[in-house]
Amino acid sequence: MQIALFQPDIPQNTGTILRLCACLDVAAHIIEPAGFATSDRTFRRAGMDYLDQVRLTRHDSWSKFEQWRRGLGHRLLLFTTKGAGSYLDYAYKPADILLFGRESMGVTDEVLAAADARLVIPIKPGLRSLNVAMAAAMAIGEALRQTGPAAKFA
């Protein structure tokens, strides 16, 4: 199981998600361009000393990420407010990549079209969306509940 962030623009959210990935032994991907540098103080504070523990790959562009992903044959599951099905009703596989869009705009039409599934976390009508770090935690929790953790923890 892996988490990918498409052009993230809020450093605190990205740091929090990378900390989550480190704690759960889940690989992480940042698809550039990000809206901040990894030296950003708020990014480092949110990730704390866990950033050195995460298996992080930075991809220079969407096309390079997509070439890498297709080469391995991994499914791409996009979490979006425009999802076609609930994330709770989906059957996850251990090699899936859970993709989250940019906080300010989501993903491009090209990314939307490339997704093998578009999933939504149902929320109360009239509200826009969850914080992306909270959405990532909920999504990876359900995916790992179904598939089991990547590593056995004591």
Which residues are covered by each model-predicted region?
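Post-transcriptional modification and biogenesis factors for structured RNAs
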Residues: M1-A154
